Amino acid sequence: MARGPKKHLKRVAAPKHWMLDKLTGVFAPRPSTGPHKLRECLPLIIFLRNRLKYALTGDEVKKICMQRFIKIDGKVRTDTTYPVGFMDVISIEKTGEHFRLVYDTKGRFAVHRITAEEAKYKLCKVRKTFVGTKAIPHLVTHDARTIRYPDPLIKMNDTIQIDLETGKITDFIKFDTGNMCMVTGGANLGRIGVITNREKHPGSFDVVHVKDANGNSFATRLSNIFVIGKGNKPWISLPRGKGIRLTIAEERDKRLAAKQNNG
């Protein structure tokens, strides 16, 4: 019987959003254990090699990491398979570039460049709040941070803004109708809109209705909702397309229009 952790990941079993082709090898990089789940993260090697094209091979990625050029959420990471996930800030000191991992409307991680000013903070969803030993209140975020003595107004499903230098909470957004959110799971992954209402289903999943900037409405589970702004003012810069998913016909029309303008 096999003992211990799994160390390999076959290429065909890798998450679809990594966009690895099936025929270039047998294995895929298995993400290390870390703050994000295997199916919801992007190993650092794939980000540097396949997305940014800063390296051609895994060996080159290792050389980049070992020179301590790559920071994730303000901390140097030398592990090439470190799991980078939603809302993480990747900074490359040498080139002065900063990226935030957010989903595009196709449900893949977009290469989203941000300013040095924006790279100083990140948003985290509150997964749970509890009172620990000696009656110390704690909260746990979506990226496995445990923060003690939070503001007593912060509850589950709210979003907190964390200063990456100190790890302290600087501000928070309540989970409320009328606030801007991004969908982080399910069929509507990557869509951005304003929360219109929440249906409570005791014993089952609460359903949240969201309306995007084009006026299209859709519904998803509460667990898939990540609040990113108060009202319709987002606290982070949004990726291209602003989280509005086009239908196939709209995409085609947009392509044709772009072709005619260029032609």
Swiss-Prot record:
Q: Which GO terms describe its cellular component?
A: cytosolic small ribosomal subunit; nucleolus; ribonucleoprotein complex; ribosome; small-subunit processome
Task: Cite the entry's keywords alphabetically.
Answer: Acetylation, Cytoplasm, Isopeptide bond, Nucleus, Ribonucleoprotein, Ribosomal protein, RNA-binding, rRNA-binding, Ubl conjugation
Q: Is this entry keyworded RNA-binding? A: yes
Domain S4 RNA-binding intervals: 42-104
- The UniProt feature for the cross-link Glycyl lysine isopeptide (Lys-Gly) (interchain with G-Cter in SUMO2) gives its location as 230
One of the record's GO molecular function terms: RNA binding
The record's section on InterPro entries has: KOW, Rib_uL2_dom2, Ribosomal_eS4, Ribosomal_eS4_C, Ribosomal_eS4_central_region, Ribosomal_eS4_central_sf, Ribosomal_eS4_KOW, Ribosomal_eS4_N
- Supply the Pfam families for this chain: 40S_S4_C, KOW, Ribosomal_S4e, RS4NT, S4
Q: Tell me the superkingdom of the source.
A: Eukaryota
Q: Which GO terms describe its biological process?
A: ribosomal small subunit biogenesis; translation
SMART domains attached to this UniProt entry = S4 (SM00363)
Which of the residues bear the PTM N6-acetyllysine? 233
The entry's localization annotation reads: Cytoplasm; Nucleus, Nucleolus
Q: What does this protein do?
A: Component of the small ribosomal subunit. The ribosome is a large ribonucleoprotein complex responsible for the synthesis of proteins in the cell. Part of the small subunit (SSU) processome, first precursor of the small eukaryotic ribosomal subunit. During the assembly of the SSU processome in the nucleolus, many ribosome biogenesis factors, an RNA chaperone and ribosomal proteins associate with the nascent pre-rRNA and work in concert to generate RNA folding, modifications, rearrangements and cleavage as well as targeted degradation of pre-ribosomal RNA by the RNA exosome.
Assembly notes: Component of the small ribosomal subunit. Part of the small subunit (SSU) processome, composed of more than 70 proteins and the RNA chaperone small nucleolar RNA (snoRNA) U3. Identified in a IGF2BP1-dependent mRNP granule complex containing untranslated mRNAs.
| HAMAP family, alphabetized | Ribosomal_eS4
Q: Which family does it belong to?
A: Belongs to the eukaryotic ribosomal protein eS4 family.
Name recorded for this polypeptide: Small ribosomal subunit protein eS4, X isoform
